[in-house]
């Protein structure tokens, strides 16, 4: 099937069997032969918008006669001979020059037809003829509509009430793509006036360099190959007896420059049709008329855009039309499946799989729609949003050949209408290359053969097109090919939907057209000639309402339109394609016309947010962050067509092309756009909204002195309002701060536009508002509040949710809540103003939360704001004080932990009155009382106000710890006393480490006073339980907290104070006072009874327990000695050390036990190992505090200490000895050595092993005079049998200090005196220690600072009175530590970590009577040189060496100076 309008007469027969065609080159008539060819998919062809010349055709029907149509005269400026007159010959008469079509269409079926057809040959005259031959046997659904609205002064006017029906039918001539029955479409031509085609401009655009001889010469080069394919087609069809014109692509005729615009189609001079039969049936009469009209020559060529569309009434029909620079959307109530393949120019095409509205050739989804835009008179067109691949359109001076063809998958192109991919604008009007088609072959039945031939021919043309591209860019060859379309997979599919709901519409857009008849909706005066569907926004003429198809709106039916892919070879995943040649050739640019500014079109890659990528198939994809418009899917919601607006990507290209160079940054993107007018009664431009600007582009300004653009800063807009009056029923007025007013009229969607504009203003005001708060700009914030208050109170949308806010990309200056920012700035005035503003606009900002769940109250605590800010927040009526953050903490939790002001009690009370739960637990189980323990500034004040408001002190967290555990861990004695006074239970065992508060205090040992306090309270609690006096526990605890030893202070007055009035209870209390030894179980054995009787007379502090063996658990043996064994065990959940002695029946054992127990029971100090109780049966046991790190002896042997550790250990040992010596009565240890100083897990040193310890009393003088202890640690007076006193303990302490110093310096341990070889006999040591001539002591390492050596010398001085006490030694040691800290480097140099050389051997001393005098008189033993003397000699030698070296250097310098 082909459609041609040749310059020469082309006659086509109506019947395929006996029709013939004759071509005469001398004939300049335009003949349109419509005969009984194969059924075609083309139903309507329309050329619109020509300015001066009109091709007016009016067809009058005759069922039995052929029809000729007269065409207007066209004058061409080309060398080709132009026709001078135009006639349409018909046997029965002439036709009027205008064909008018009715908007209503009916359908009927023709079951039969005639096989006869007539052919006519044109004579040699200057008439352009259109001959229509009637063939009834094979009716074709082909209807033609030439022309548009006639001029008012035209003499050929048509009565609007008269019309002609065009009968269009389809026959089942192919099993592949036609229905099983014939159809004919009766189209009543009675539509409003339409615009006509300026045929003169078609001729004027033919380049003068082209002649028919060149065309024929090019044609003959390929004639043979085309004839071969034609012969094959004829053999397959067996019914083609006419020499039809086939598409021939010669060397020059196949040139298709990739830079050419679709406007080159305006140079087409003729249109021909062959093998297309049309039955034109009228309603009643069959008359024929002929008329001739003359035309007026046009002085300026008009640029056109072709459009191809499918008709909604005939699925197999295509509308080919031309319009001036306007994009008309296809009807929104249907979607079409893609027929197979249509190919268009590669230079300015944009391909996609989903399109209905393309500037240029408009094809439905998947049909091969082409988007080709150009800019006549400088009016920028909408860039393509969706399109499909289209091949070249071959154009000729004699004909345009429109044939079905296969889609050439090798042809790939991308076009954006305004710009190429490289960013250069396309040429507005390139000169086409024209070819003369002399042979055309169509196929009727065999679709496969025809498709293959056309594919081969098409590939040759495509290859040659690229070959010729480099030689010339002035020639464009366009070709539209369309093969037989299978009806089943590619026919349009309409899913069920509902009926339209039309309402009257005042059409004010001159570019708007009816979705049914495609005619303009707008006319003067404005009236209600149009109707709009309330559901899908379909706009049609009032007369076209009956033709409207069913409404697919989602409001009535959720059905969606299925768009299957008609071409499986071309994958739908390819969104757009572009060949390298077409991309590179698009760099040529042309000047746009009519702009006051002429900005160059930006490339896609230069627009922020757009990205070009390529895949393996050389296809280019345009990606955008805002919207993916390259739709590959087959199911699309019909609501997509509700609003007739451009896509975001297309709008972005338009926007940047129009307003580039106008001061708008490139990162500005149009959020939305609307068709409207400025101070006008009709819509003539487009309004763009960006985040910072309101931009208007005037499409009807042709004066170069006037600007097309109007730009308003959003920040400069003072107010907006709706206007509805007179001829401006839908207007928006914008007033700026500089007293300018802009009225935008005739919005199609004014409510949406106003809503978006209002949302944009509120967003800008919010930005200014936020910037002022973040910058702590109080005046700026006040100004923003005044404007925003007025806006919010007068806004149209009360819910405050604007759709445009989801499109805005500009973030706020801070992610924080604005009120929080003001609180962080600690600006009282700003916070108060904000609170008043939020109250005025009924905002709940006071309770807003951030990403972590923090409210402004939470934030106020962390910001350390003033008390006034906090009180203003609490005084807000709607403030919620129980809001939790992501950790479950309320503002009260953080307030108790973080707040530092002494006014905290007033604020806590205010929060409690507002409803804060004082016992609220966070996700860790902590209450505000737990948090208050961590407050370092107002801890007691916080705890007091919480306890005053009845806070529960025994609530435990997830680890089972109460607030008392927290106080013990932090060592807060004052808080612990306050909690205990409020009823805190010290016996609560935690879940984490299974410890009570007392056990935790002992382990941590942060504050010894807490341990002592908890021990006393534990004793009181146990005593009251034994005597069944638990109800007085709280009163006695309070008394104990106020003053220690409440049990010892019990008297009648105190009993009255605590409320004890019962005589029996008072007797129990007095008995408790006298028996401070608390016995749980009575003794059974005689030895145990003796011990108990002796223990009752002892002065036992705070009451020690008699423990049953069943309460102990032995876990590990840790040592043994002469007096017994030591085990590690557990008592009441506490790790203890259990010293097991012999049986209580042994008298010596009882005596030693009672003395040691008496000393331990009388001592209460954190420097002494604690005693928990005793076990009397079956063996005597002492239950004492466990020290996990062992003794000092084991500690220094395992890990040699540093100087810091040395001072720490010695200070604690001296403190422990001082505690013994300061006790009443005084306790003398008598066995001081490194083994008897224990170290717990916190490296705290405690004095232990009091088996040899005695009270320094007169009754113990005999015992104290006995030699006891380890010989190397014993003082000389002990060996001589003199009285043992506290300074004897200090001698032993000097030896212990030497042991530790030796480990520090040499990094190893040595027993005292071991440096003297083979002197291990204790008697020999005692002899040398007490010798009057020689005083033997351990050797102090060389280099030890003198201040420390002096202290050691004093401690082991032979003269008892010269030795310091424990207190004096502690003071001297503090001086040594101070000097160490001041000269740390010098002290560190002493540490050598090398063991010294042994000193000379000392001869052994024999044991015989008179040995002392013998050795003193006869033994010639040289005294050992003092280490101090050796050290001084070494230092003196070093000094002399340094002085000699300095003298030598000085002499050398003097000699050098003399020589110079």
From Swiss-Prot:
Keywords: ANK repeat, ATP-binding, Coiled coil, Cytoplasm, Cytoskeleton, Kinase, Membrane, Metal-binding, Nucleotide-binding, Nucleus, Repeat, Serine/threonine-protein kinase, Transferase, Transmembrane, Transmembrane helix, Zinc, Zinc-finger. It is an enzyme of class 2 (transferase). It is found in: Cytoplasm, Cytoskeleton; Membrane; Nucleus. One of its GO terms (molecular function) is zinc ion binding. The keyword rRNA-binding does not apply. Involved in the development of the fruiting body. Overexpression phenocopies the spnA null phenotype. Residues 149-162 have a biased composition (Basic and acidic residues). One of its GO terms (biological process) is signal transduction. The lineage of its organism: Eukaryota, Amoebozoa, Evosea, Eumycetozoa, Dictyostelia. Residues 129-140, 329-345, 384-404, 423-434, 559-568 have a biased composition (Polar residues). Disruption phenotype: Null cells show weak and late developmental defects. It comes from the Eukaryota. It holds the Pfam family GRAM. Residues 1-32, 57-181, 216-259, 272-311, 329-354, 374-510, 551-608, 1434-1460 are annotated as: Disordered. This is Ankyrin repeat-containing protein kinase A. Its main location: cytoplasm. CDD domains: C1 (cd00029). GO terms for cellular component: cortical cytoskeleton; cytoplasm; membrane; nucleus. Its EC number is 2.7.11.1. Residues 653-724 form the GRAM domain. The gene is arkA. Residues 8-32, 61-86, 111-128, 220-259, 272-300, 405-422, 435-461, 486-497, 569-608 have a biased composition (Low complexity).
């Amino acid at each position: 099937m082909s459609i041609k309008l040749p310059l020469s007469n082309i006659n086509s027969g109506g019947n395929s069997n006996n029709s013939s065609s004759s071509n005469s080159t001398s004939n300049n008539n335009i003949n349109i032969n419509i005969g009984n060819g194969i059924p075609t998919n083309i139903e309507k062809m329309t050329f619109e918008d020509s300015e001066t010349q009109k091709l007016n055709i009016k067809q009058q029907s005759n069922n039995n006669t052929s029809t000729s149509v007269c065409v207007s005269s066209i004058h061409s400026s080309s060398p080709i001979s132009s026709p001078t007159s135009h006639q349409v010959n018909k046997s029965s008469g002439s036709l009027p020059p205008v064909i008018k079509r009715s908007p209503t269409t009916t359908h009927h079926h023709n079951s039969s037809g005639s096989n006869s057809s007539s052919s006519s040959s044109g004579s040699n005259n200057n008439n352009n003829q259109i001959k229509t031959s009637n063939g009834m046997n094979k009716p074709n659904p082909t209807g033609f509509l030439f022309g548009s609205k006639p001029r008012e002064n035209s003499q050929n006017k048509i009565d609007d009430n008269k019309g002609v029906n065009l009968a269009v039918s389809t026959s089942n001539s192919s099993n592949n793509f036609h229905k099983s029955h014939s159809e004919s479409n009766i189209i009543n031509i009675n539509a409003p006036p339409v615009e006509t085609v300026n045929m003169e401009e078609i001729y004027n655009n033919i380049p003068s360099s082209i002649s028919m001889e060149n065309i024929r010469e090019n044609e003959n080069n390929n004639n043979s190959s085309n004839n071969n394919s034609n012969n094959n087609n004829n053999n397959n069809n067996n019914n083609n007896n006419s020499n039809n014109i086939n598409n021939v692509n010669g060397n020059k005729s196949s040139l298709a420059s990739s830079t050419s615009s679709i406007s080159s189609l305006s140079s087409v001079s003729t249109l021909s049709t062959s093998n297309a039969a049309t039955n034109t049936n009228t309603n009643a009469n069959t008359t024929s008329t002929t008329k001739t009209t003359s035309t007026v020559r046009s002085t300026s060529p008009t640029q056109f855009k072709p459009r191809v569309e499918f008709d909604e009434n005939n699925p197999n029909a295509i509308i080919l039309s031309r319009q001036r620079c306007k994009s008309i959307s296809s009807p929104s109530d249907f979607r079409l499946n893609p027929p197979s393949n249509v190919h268009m120019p590669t230079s300015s095409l944009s391909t996609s799989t989903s399109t209905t509205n393309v500037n240029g050739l408009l094809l439905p989804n998947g049909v091969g729609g082409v988007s080709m835009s150009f800019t006549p008179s400088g009016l920028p067109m909408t860039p393509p949003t969706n399109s499909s691949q289209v091949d070249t359109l071959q154009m000729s001076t004699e004909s345009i050949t429109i044939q079905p063809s296969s889609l050439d998958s090798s042809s790939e192109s991308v076009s954006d209408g305004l710009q190429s991919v490289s960013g250069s604008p396309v040429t507005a009007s390139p000169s086409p290359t024209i070819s003369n088609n002399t042979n055309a072959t169509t196929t009727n039945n065999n679709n496969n053969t025809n498709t293959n031939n056309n594919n081969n021919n098409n590939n040759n043309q495509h290859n040659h097109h690229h070959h010729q591209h480099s030689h010339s860019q002035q020639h464009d060859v366009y070709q539209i090919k369309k093969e037989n379309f299978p009806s089943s997979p590619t026919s349009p599919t309409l899913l069920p939907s509902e009926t339209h709901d039309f309402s009257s519409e005042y059409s004010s857009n001159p570019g708007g057209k009816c979705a049914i008849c495609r005619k303009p909706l707008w006319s003067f005066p404005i009236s209600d000639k149009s109707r709009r569907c309330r559901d899908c926004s379909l706009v049609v003429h009032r007369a076209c309402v009956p033709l409207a198809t069913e409404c697919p709106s989602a409001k009535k039916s959720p059905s969606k339109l299925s768009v299957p892919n008609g071409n499986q070879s071309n994958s739908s995943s390819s969104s757009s394609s572009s060949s390298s040649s077409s991309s590179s050739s698009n760099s040529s640019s042309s000047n746009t016309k009519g702009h006051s500014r002429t900005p160059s079109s930006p490339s896609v890659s230069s627009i922020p947010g757009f990205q070009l990528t390529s895949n393996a198939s050389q296809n280019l994809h345009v990606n955008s962050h805002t919207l993916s418009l390259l739709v590959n899917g087959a199911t699309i919601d019909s609501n997509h067509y509700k609003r007739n607006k451009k896509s975001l990507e297309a709008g972005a290209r338009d926007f940047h092309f129009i307003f580039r160079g106008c001061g708008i940054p490139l990162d500005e993107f149009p959020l939305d756009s609307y068709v409207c007018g400025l101070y006008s009664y009709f819509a003539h431009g487009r309004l763009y909204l960006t985040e910072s600007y309101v931009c208007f582009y005037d499409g009807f300004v042709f004066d170069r002195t006037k600007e097309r653009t109007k730009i308003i800063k959003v920040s400069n807009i003072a107010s907006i309002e709706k206007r509805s009056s007179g001829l401006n029923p839908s207007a928006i007025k914008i007033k700026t701060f500089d007293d300018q007013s802009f009225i935008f009229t005739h919005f199609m969607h004014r409510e949406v536009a106003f809503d978006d504009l209002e949302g944009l203003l509120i967003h800008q005001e919010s930005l200014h508002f936020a910037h002022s708060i973040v910058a702590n700009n109080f005046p700026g914030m006040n100004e923003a509040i005044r404007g925003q208050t007025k806006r919010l109170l007068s806004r149209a949308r009360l819910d405050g949710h604007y759709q445009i806010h989801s499109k805005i990309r500009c973030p706020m200056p801070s992610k924080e809540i604005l009120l929080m920012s003001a609180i962080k700035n600690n600006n009282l005035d700003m916070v108060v103003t904000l609170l008043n503003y939020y109250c005025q606009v009924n905002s709940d900002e006071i309770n807003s939360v951030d990403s972590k769940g923090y409210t402004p109250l939470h934030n106020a605590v962390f910001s350390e704001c003033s008390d006034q800010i906090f009180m203003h927040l609490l005084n807000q009526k709607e403030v919620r004080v129980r809001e939790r953050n992501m950790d479950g903490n309320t503002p009260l939790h953080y307030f108790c932990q973080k707040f530092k002001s002494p006014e905290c009690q007033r604020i806590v009370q205010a929060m409690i009155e507002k409803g804060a739960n004082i016992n609220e637990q966070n996700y860790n189980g902590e209450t505000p009382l737990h948090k208050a323990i961590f407050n370092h500034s107002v801890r007691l004040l916080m705890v007091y106000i919480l306890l005053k408001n009845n806070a529960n002190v025994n609530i435990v967290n997830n680890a089972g710890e109460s607030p008392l555990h927290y106080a013990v861990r932090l060592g807060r004695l004052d808080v612990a006393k306050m909690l205990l006074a409020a009823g805190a239970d010290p016996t609560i065992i935690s879940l984490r480490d299974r410890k009570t508060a007392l056990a935790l205090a002992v382990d941590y040992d942060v504050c010894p006073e807490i341990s002592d306090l908890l021990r006393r309270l534990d004793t009181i609690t146990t005593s009251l339980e034994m005597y069944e006096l638990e109800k007085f526990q709280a009163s006695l605890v309070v008394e104990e907290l106020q003053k220690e030893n409440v049990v010892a202070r019990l008297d009648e007055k105190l009993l009255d104070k605590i409320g004890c009035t019962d005589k029996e209870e008072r007797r129990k209390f007095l008995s408790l006072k006298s028996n401070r030894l608390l016995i749980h179980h009575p003794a059974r054995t005689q030895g145990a009874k003796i011990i108990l009787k002796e223990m009752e007379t002892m002065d036992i502090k705070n009451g020690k327990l008699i423990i049953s063996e069943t309460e102990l658990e032995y876990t590990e043996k840790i040592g043994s000695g002469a007096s017994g064994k030591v085990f590690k065990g557990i008592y009441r959940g506490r790790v203890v050390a259990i010293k097991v002695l012999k049986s209580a029946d042994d008298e010596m054992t009882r005596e030693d036990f009672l003395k040691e127990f008496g000393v331990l029971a009388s001592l209460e100090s954190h420097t002494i190992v604690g005693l928990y109780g005793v076990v009397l049966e079956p063996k005597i046991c002492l239950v004492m505090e466990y020290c996990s790190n062992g003794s000092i002896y084991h500690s220094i042997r395992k890990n040699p200490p540093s100087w810091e550790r040395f001072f720490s250990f010695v200070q604690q040992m001296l403190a422990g000895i001082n505690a013994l010596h300061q006790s009443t009565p005084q306790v003398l240890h008598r066995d001081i050595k490194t083994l008897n100083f224990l170290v717990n897990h916190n490296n705290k040193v405690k004095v232990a092993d009091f088996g040899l310890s005695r009270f320094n009393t007169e009754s113990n003088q005999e015992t104290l005079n006995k030699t006891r202890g380890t010989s190397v640690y014993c003082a000389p007076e002990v060996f001589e049998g003199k009285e043992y006193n506290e300074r004897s303990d200090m001698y032993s302490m000097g030896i212990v200090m030497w042991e530790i110093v030796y480990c520090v310096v040499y990094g190893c341990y040595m027993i005292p005196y071991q440096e003297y070889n083979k002197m291990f006999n204790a008697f020999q040591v005692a002899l040398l220690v007490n010798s009057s001539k020689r005083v033997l002591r351990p050797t102090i390492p060389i280099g030890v600072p003198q201040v420390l050596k002096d202290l050691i010398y004093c401690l082991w001085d032979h003269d008892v009175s010269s030795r310091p006490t424990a207190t004096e030694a502690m003071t001297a040691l503090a001086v040594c530590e101070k000097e160490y800290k001041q000269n740390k480097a010098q002290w560190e140099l002493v540490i050598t970590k090398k063991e010294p050389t042994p000193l000379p051997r000392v001869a052994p001393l024999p044991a015989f009577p008179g040995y002392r005098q013998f050795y003193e008189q006869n033994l010639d033993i040289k005294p050992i040189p003092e280490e101090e003397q050796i050290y001084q000699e070494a230092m003196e030698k070093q000094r002399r060496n340094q002085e000699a070296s300095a003298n030598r250097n000085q002499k050398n310098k003097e000699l050098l100076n003399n020589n110079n």
